[in-house]
Swiss-Prot record:
The gene is CYP75B3. This is Flavonoid 3'-monooxygenase CYP75B3. It is a single-pass membrane protein. GO terms for molecular function: flavonoid 3'-monooxygenase activity; heme binding; iron ion binding. It comes from Oryza sativa subsp. japonica (Rice). GO terms for biological process: flavonoid biosynthetic process. Induction: Induced by light. The chain crosses the membrane at residues 6-26. It is an enzyme of class 1 (oxidoreductase).
Length: 526
């Protein structure tokens, strides 16, 4: 994806710089008596004219912000164009924001992605906090993410994972892109729950590759700090070409969502649902509510087709690639650490045996596998920087003044590598989470701010429970079902572990592996 590098924009901004400084000082940017009596703003680096600190972020902003935290402390301030940005880079500071001031930071700041991709804020992820947002979240919880819904859909998850494993067992002599295989599984599983049927063949095919490319492109675009969002005078220029790419990508997604809806309207039925009956999948429920003109929230707002498309877009993007990329990172780490892989396989053999695949009922009896998942989330959080939040009112955090309208970013990646919280933070050591160890009671569900891959507070990921079950079941089944060798004779010590930054944390080089079945043939159903 070609995005214009920020430093190349500076030559055309010289005049703007002079104007910006003039306006700044005319407005009293140097402060007055009242300002001097208030709490100080958090410290931070000096920025460029007009663009502020945007050019200093580099191609991996979470790395840059981690380094800045070492220099300025766990709470520091940046300026993105006209926007004040505060970054939380430690568990105690994150807790003050996301627990102590959660209500004040319950909204998102305006951004191009929400406008041009997410149906102008009509989705769940970027919708303003309020009755409509709560109603959308309740719908998802009731039909997908509640304990009852998760239990009802257990057979769907286990069935799709079994199909993935069967397909891999047939390819044991071939090199496979593990992330792609995991993405097909995650997408088909979610599709059966949301629209009632698979969207890809089990072996993926061209459609699956195209869809993954679309999701990766969306996450890359969403991870770009778009100059137009922070310098309003330059918005119309779209100097990085980000908005134009977003609009093109939105049209592709919109065609996809329209296809799902039109197919259902034309009478196509979900798997296992008789003609003329509504299915229990989310799309059936939403279309029924729309046709019956049921109210979406207490304000009398009714659900629209655009609402449905926006919600499906959230689910098919946030709920697929995050899962598959985490599974890919987990297997990469296990291949690099064969002793950890063998320990996990020994536990699985003891609990499950070699005559069947893992089921979800096995997972609570697999403490070492659970530790592997937690350690993978720690080193490779799917969202390294939290989605931004906005201060509704001025507040005080850690002795500093946080101005009204400031954007909050939580560096999830840096917090999970904080040496004051995690001994040997750069080492992959699942044993740190085992019973009797220092982090035995840490979970990933938002209560322990040292490990928040799904976020925390009222804007925590709505699909946390689904995502955690999928990542754990997929990883457990792959570890149990196969021994793994790297493709093309590569050795584990040479495995590329570089990151490719986006809104989600991708591998720079896809993991190419050869699966070698290790269970009884009957376990695979082949």
């Amino acid at each position: 994806m070609d995005v214009v590098p920020l430093p190349l924009l500076l030559g055309s901004l010289a005049v703007s710089a002079a104007v910006w400084y003039l306006v700044y000082f005319l407005r009293g940017g140097s402060g007055g008596d009242a300002a001097r009596k208030r709490r100080p703003l958090p410290p931070g680096p000096r920025g460029w004219p007009v663009l502020g600190n945007l050019p200093q972020l580099g191609d991996k902003p979470h790395h840059t912000m981690c380094a800045l935290a070492r220099q300025y402390g766990p709470l520091f301030r940046l300026r993105f164009g006209c926007a004040e940005v505060v970054v939380a880079a430690s568990a105690p500071v994150a807790a003050q924001f996301l627990r102590g001031h959660d209500a004040n930071f319950s909204n998102r700041p305006p951004n191009s992605g929400a406008e041009h991709v997410a149906y102008n804020y009509q989705d769940l992820v970027f919708a303003p906090y309020g009755a409509r947002w709560r109603a959308l979240r309740k719908l998802c919880a009731l039909h997908l993410f509640s304990a009852k819904a998760l239990d009802d859909l257990r057979a769907v998850r286990e069935g799709e994972v079994a199909l993935m494993v069967r397909n891999l067992a047939r390819q044991q002599a071939a090199s496979v892109a593990l992330g792609q295989e995991a993405n097909v599984c995650a997408t088909n599983t979610l599709a059966r729950a949301t629209i009632g049927h698979r969207v890809f063949a089990v072996d993926g095919g061209e459609g699956a590759r195209e869809f993954k490319e679309m999701v990766v492109e969306l996450m890359q675009l969403a991870g770009v700090f778009n100059v137009g969002d922070f310098v309003p005078a330059l918005r119309w220029l779209d100097p990085q070409g980000v908005v134009a790419k977003m609009k093109r990508l939105h049209r592709r997604y919109d065609n996809m969502m329209n296809g799902f809806i039109n197919e259902r309207k034309a009478g196509a039925q979900p798997d296992g649902v008789a003609a003329g009956e509504h299915g229990n999948d989310l799309l059936s429920v939403l279309l029924a509510r729309m046709q019956e003109e049921q109210k979406l929230d207490g304000d009398g707002e009714k659900i629209t087709e655009t609402d449905i498309k926006a919600l499906l877009l959230n689910l098919f993007t946030a709920g697929t690639d995050t899962t598959s990329s985490t599974v890919e990172w987990a297997l990469a780490e296990l291949i690099r650490h064969p002793d950890v892989l063998k320990e996990a396989q020994h536990e699985l053999d003891t609990v499950v045996g070699r005559g069947r695949l893992v089921s979800e009922s096995d997972l609570p009896r697999l403490p070492y596998l659970t530790a592997v998942i937690k350690e993978t989330f720690r080193l490779h959080p799917s969202t390294p920087l939290s989605l931004p939040r906005e201060a509704a009112e001025e507040c005080e955090v850690d002795g500093y003044r946080i101005p009204k309208g400031a954007t909050l970013l939580v560096n999830v990646w840096a917090i999970a590598r904080d040496p004051t919280q995690w001994p040997d933070p750069l080492q992959y050591q699942p044993s740190r989470f085992l019973p009797g160890r220092m982090h035995a009671d840490v979970d990933v569900k938002g209560a322990d701010f040292g490990l928040i891959p799904f976020g925390a507070g009222r804007r925590i990921c709505a699909g946390l429970s689904w995502g955690l079950r999928m990542v754990t079941l997929m990883t457990a089944t792959l570890v149990h079902g196969f021994d793994w060798t790297l493709a093309n004779g590569a050795t584990p010590d040479k495995l590329n572990m570089e990151e490719a930054y986006g809104l989600t944390l991708q591998r720079a080089v896809p993991l190419m592996v050869q699966p070698v079945p290790r269970l009884l043939p009957s376990a695979y159903g082949v």
